[in-house]
Amino acid sequence: MSRILVDTSIWIDYFEDKDSYTIIDRLVIDNLICTNDLILAELVPFFHLQEKDELVEALMALQKYEIRIDWPQLIHMQISNLKHGINGVGVPDLIILENVLVNDLILFTKDKHFMLMKDVFDFKMFDYKELKRR
């Protein structure tokens, strides 16, 4: 199975209520979760200020996929979004999507922009709801 890039939206929900995403624990144990510097930059400062050092260490220990930004590609992606009526997608989301595409990762998110972009770009999303039904 490909690595699963857990988006900030899922991590925030998980840390607020671990029972809401128990699958995260299993994915960590199975060593399937990965991250990147953008997601870490969104999460780590908040936990650092709360002095949750063990949590910061655990996040930093996850396999990390380097972000190599291809700016012309991001511009092309945003143009494709706009042509398909998908407005308001921020550059950070485009960078995350590019990281997913380049490294053939599975994205675990609840962000509506990614749900919309799924119809435009060929990438895999982790379907936690489907997994819960089994």
Which positions does each model-derived feature cover?
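Short, hinge-like loop/turn segments at secondary-structure boundaries
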Residues: 50-54, 82-83, 124-127
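Structured helix-beta-strand junction loops
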Residues: 29-31, 58-62, 84, 103, ...
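General small-molecule cofactor/ligand-binding pocket signal
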Residues: 34, 65, 124-126
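A generic structural signal for short hydrophobic patches within well-formed alpha-helices
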Residues: 11-12, 40-43, 114-115
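Short, well-structured N-terminal submotif of metal-dependent ribonuclease cores
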Residues: 1-35, 45-57, 132
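Acidic, PIN/NYN-like endoribonuclease modules and their adjacent C-terminal/linker elements
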Residues: 1-3, 97, 102-134
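Active-site neighborhoods of divalent-metal-dependent phosphate/nucleic-acid chemistry enzymes
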Residues: 65-110
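Active-site-proximal, substrate-binding regions of enzyme catalytic domains
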Residues: 38, 44-77
